[in-house]
Amino acid sequence: MRSGECDEEEIQAKQERDQNQNHQVNLNHMLQQQQPSSVSSSRQWTSAFRNPRIVRVSRTFGGKDRHSKVCTVRGLRDRRIRLSVPTAIQLYDLQDRLGLSQPSKVIDWLLEAAKDDVDKLPPLQFPHGFNQMYPNLIFGNSGFGESPSSTTSTTFPGTNLGFLENWDLGGSSRTRARLTDTTTTQRESFDLDKGKWIKNDENSNQDHQGFNTNHQQQFPLTNPYNNTSAYYNLGHLQQSLDQSGNNVTVAISNVAANNNNNLNLHPPSSSAGDGSQLFFGPTPPAMSSLFPTYPSFLGASHHHHVVDGAGHLQLFSSNSNTASQQHMMPGNTSLIRPFHHLMSSNHDTDHHSSDNESDS
């Protein structure tokens, strides 16, 4: 009897152990099934948020592993790099000497140390049809909340990959700064200690955005590229206004939505967009904070040209109460002559004004 009872107890204990083991195996299996999906989804989200150039290729579309790829001019490239034995030994020795936690940070340190030599290299050439190969990599929000701009096509002709403005093709931060517009694009820097992309001038960028918003309310500019080119050219114009003691203020207003006509002032013959006007006059109190004063290049004895209407030039002298009006060219789009030729063309414009008065 005792032997039979012992056998039954052993059988029951064994069954309980088997049930517990099966239950534990089922729980582990369920956790293993749920964990990869959540981890992979979170990794995909964070990777897409940090860098839009990181791409994950599914196994159904030819992907061979779970590691993500990066988009380059030669296509998708693996993030893992196989090193030779001597190179790997030197890399790990350098990691220990620098006190870095990851071998990849050694590569970041080497790239930063060689940034001057990298800047001297010729730029990469984009292959034909590069934007058609990866249409889903067009710059949208990409985690930074920025909208695409017309400077993308001008920075990278033939492509619409605006994310390349934020993520340089292996270049240093100095090269990346030349490719981007510093007033609208957030500059990023790689933190070697944390290994993350951080925003190191978010406050200054917000100040730039606030200035652009207030400026566009006073001087509407439909094309953001015209805003950049106009101020760039006005800087050259202001340098030439140093021949007289009269104060002249330079401003822009009413630039029309014609994206094909850019405002250029320093070339020999340039055109302004439809409805664009340039104002040169004494500095009002409200404008003194936005535009500094510069000496006028027009003397007190000269007639100051005022051209109103669509696409005309207006010059106001601080010594004259009234200004004569003259059309430089008929039509919606006018050609503005170089400003260093205005002094020599006074006789021609006066003769043209007398002809217009006789015709009227």
Curated annotation (Swiss-Prot):
Residues 3-33 form a coiled coil. Residues 63-121 form the TCP domain. Keywords: Coiled coil, Developmental protein, DNA-binding, Nucleus, Transcription, Transcription regulation. GO terms for cellular component: nucleus. Expressed in cotyledons, particularly in the vascular region, in leaves, buds, flowers and immature siliques. Pfam families: TCP (PF03634). It is found in: Nucleus. Its main location: nucleus. Plays a pivotal role in the control of morphogenesis of shoot organs by negatively regulating the expression of boundary-specific genes such as CUC genes, probably through the induction of miRNA (e.g. miR164). Participates in ovule development. This is Transcription factor TCP5. It comes from Arabidopsis thaliana. The lineage of its organism: Eukaryota, Viridiplantae, Streptophyta, Embryophyta, Tracheophyta.
